[in-house]
């Protein structure tokens, strides 16, 4: 509870005092179970579903969130801003960023830049997904094929990039 929150804040402060930054690994692309607060709050709004009713599982780990829907995007953005403001997080590594949409990732980058200065907070992620996802409409995902649509201060890495560099 409360003690753990204080301990985490003290840990981050000590890391900063030692001259290091803190990058938080975030998994916003899916939830483990459909028995979530998202589903309890607004059934099926926060999740991607294929036309046949199958819940999208592009992460191969759970249920894909619909980042292209406004309230889902708002939740993710406000969560990132909260961690940054309240805990002084220096950056974020987005797990399976390729399941989140380009507009949301650029919006996160823009908000962090407005509050802290251009590129002062680190953003990078995995520009891929394990499986196909049921993204709505013409929304573009923050996947390898759309890297050029992301803000220049959003980094990406994956096995194929690593292998290309290694040769």
Question: What annotation goes with each model-predicted range?
Answer:
Residues 18, 96-167:
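Active-site-proximal helices and loops of the catalytic beta/alpha 8
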């Amino acid at each position: 509870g409360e003690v753990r929150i204080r301990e985490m804040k003290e840990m981050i402060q000590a890391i900063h005092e030692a001259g290091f930054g803190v990058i938080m690994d975030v998994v916003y692309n899916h939830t483990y179970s459909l028995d979530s607060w998202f589903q309890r709050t607004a059934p099926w709004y926060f999740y991607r579903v294929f036309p046949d009713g199958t819940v999208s599982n592009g992460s191969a780990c759970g249920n894909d969130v619909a980042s292209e829907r406004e309230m889902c995007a708002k939740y993710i953005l406000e969560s990132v801003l909260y961690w940054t403001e309240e805990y002084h997080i220096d950056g974020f590594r987005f797990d399976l960023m390729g399941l989140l949409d380009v507009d949301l990732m650029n919006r996160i980058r823009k908000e962090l830049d407005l509050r802290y200065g251009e590129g002062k907070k680190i953003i990078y992620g995995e520009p891929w997904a394990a499986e196909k996802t049921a993204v709505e409409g013409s929304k573009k995902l923050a996947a390898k094929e759309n890297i050029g649509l992301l803000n220049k201060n959003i980094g990406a890495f994956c096995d194929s990039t690593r292998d290309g560099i290694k040769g």
